[in-house]
Amino acid sequence: NHLLSFSTVGQVPKAGGKVLLLLPASFTESPTQTYTMDSPVVTFTSPAANAGVASAAFNTRTLTVTMDGTGSNAGLGQGVACAMKVTNVRTPSSIVASVSTSEITTTDAANKNVDTVATVATDDVVAGSLTSMSFSSAAAATAGVSGLATVAFTTAGQVSVGGKVVVTFPAHSSELPTFGFKSDGDTPAVLFTTPSDGTKPTATGAFPAGRVLTLTTTGSNKLLQGVAHAFTIADLRNPSSVVAAATVAVETQDAASKACDGPTSTATPQIAVGTIGGTKSFVGTVKTPGVKGNHLLSFSTVGQVPKAGGK
């Protein structure tokens, strides 16, 4: 809900008079989407609840509220402080600073201007916080092992198709493993598992060299506001050596890569040393004292040993 406040100069006729709000055409931050409204409902809280609203409609940037002059509805008198609650207003798709470029105009029933002002301020729109965050890596929290990882969170704001989920993995600057969490390919398979109904989004994954995995939403489903989401990452590889628990940060963005929610952090597991398995042996071809010959060392790895500099 949003509250629109203003004071009239001239009277707005109670039968067919109108209040028009023209919202900003653009913002310096260039969000993909500016203010929109989905079937707005308008009620006056001042000067009185019986000001009377016949209809409210939103088209492109303009909210038009038409007064209802029937019965005891009073309309808007001259020199009166007014406040009206507007429901179903969607804020811009990413963070924007306040601007004073909105316009309020009141008209008579013939759509002729009564009052107008062009310096109405909108709010600062700030990043929301993701909640219920969690991250799990491969089933065995062991160095060098790859497997199915899961990231889960609940959105604050909606992410439209073409928007992104950006996951930044820890640097592990204290332990300095050869690599941190990574994918063996640049385009890991990502799959939303929650929600599981027809609103489930689809996405592609990109994980080039570095610590950042980016999901770009595709198809026709958005990430809805205030909804739990979870997605899996195929073959995410744990860091190359033992590391302490750290944090992974998740941010949602609109299609212009501008921040919507986050970044919000959650813990990564401690990555432990694996236990060498299989048949462990060191067998020589000659088994008598003092003889130089070949030996065969046999074992099975748990985690991957990096091909460049691994030991």
How should these model regions be labeled?
Residues 1-311:
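Ser/Thr/Pro/Gly-rich, low-complexity intrinsically disordered stalk/linker tracts of secreted
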